Regions:
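N-terminal glycine-/charge-rich "phosphate-binding" loop or analogous flexible N-terminal tail
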Residues: 1-55, 184
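Short beta->alpha connector loops at strand-helix junctions that form conserved
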Residues: 41, 82-83, 99-110, 187, ...
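Rossmann-like adenosine-cofactor binding region
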Residues: 65-69, 184, 188-250
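Rossmann-fold NAD(P)-binding glycine/threonine-rich loop
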Residues: 87-97, 244-250
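Phosphate-binding beta-alpha-beta segment of Rossmann-like dinucleotide-binding domains, i.e.
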Residues: 99, 105-159
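Glycine-rich Rossmann-fold phosphate-binding loop(s) that bind the pyrophosphate
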Residues: 165-166
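N-terminal Rossmann-fold NAD(P) dinucleotide-binding loop
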Residues: 169-170
């Protein structure tokens, strides 16, 4: 535990629960202008009660925020998440107690979109295989300039299905279009997107898409959304990526 300064009378207490999840270069000094600041590097669910007992504000990432973990935090007024997803919060309980909760919306749009393509190209381009092949010296020793042991296809002309067309999904669609892909989209909640992309049902998206990526929050609509049975079993060269919130949990 790090206590940045001594508390003063009637000063708000801010408890940062998972500092390590933010990286070693994170600076917390701006919080000191708002009140007493206590920093914990990590926090488990079992440690929550003791660490939040007299907190006015807690700053968390993935630790569960519910009656079992903050039920005795009688001064708690605000939960700040250093992430986008709300799936670790019991929203009904927080609303019942009048505790506000805020996330960091939109901070990762470009990064997650970039990572989506990093995952795709690693698999699609067989990068692990060809990296090892070149490093082994086999390419240099080979008698033929070409090597076709692992084939891959171009994105141009392929169909990319996107589950969840929020900010990240739209960014992925924009990049995929630049590669020449046709975009399909699906809304797990049944909402109609304001988009020119073709919106279809889940089964149609899975059957028509060469590539499928999920960019949806983990909630009641997406829990167990993806199961093995939903994927076409007779197709090869299809790619599925889920840089979202574990919508294929069993």
């Amino acid at each position: 535990m790090i206590k940045t300064k001594e508390s003063e009378d009637n000063e708000m207490k801010i408890v940062i629960l998972e500092a390590d999840s933010l990286g070693e270069d994170m600076v917390f000094t701006p919080f000191e202008a708002l009140g007493e600041v206590v920093i914990y590097r990590t926090t488990t669910a079992d440690e929550m009660e003791a660490k939040t007992l007299d907190a006015d504000v807690i700053v968390a990432n993935k630790v569960p925020i519910c009656e079992e973990t903050i039920g005795k935090a009688k001064n708690l007024k605000l939960v700040c998440l250093t992430a986008t997803g709300f799936n670790n919060l019991d929203g009904d309980y927080l609303k019942k107690r009048g505790i506000a909760a805020y996330n960091v919306a939109g901070y990762s749009t470009n990064g997650v979109a970039q990572h989506t393509f990093a995952l795709l190209f690693y698999v699609l381009e067989k990068l692990n295989y060809y990296d090892n092949y070149v490093k082994s010296g086999e390419y240099s020793r080979g008698s033929c300039f070409s090597h076709f042991a692992q084939n891959f296809f171009e994105l141009d002309g392929k169909t990319w299905g996107i589950i969840g067309l929020g900010a990240i999904g739209r960014k992925v669609a924009q990049i995929a279009e630049a590669f020449g892909c046709h975009i399909l989209c699906y809304s797990a909640s049944g909402s109609k997107y304001n988009t020119t992309y073709e919106q279809v049902g889940l089964d149609e998206l899975l059957s028509r898409s060469d590539i499928v990526s999920v960019h949806a929050p983990l909630n009641a609509y997406t829990e167990n959304l993806m199961t093995l049975e939903k994927f076409p079993q007779d197709e090869e060269d299809r790619h599925f990526s889920e840089p979202g919130k574990r919508c294929n949990r069993q």
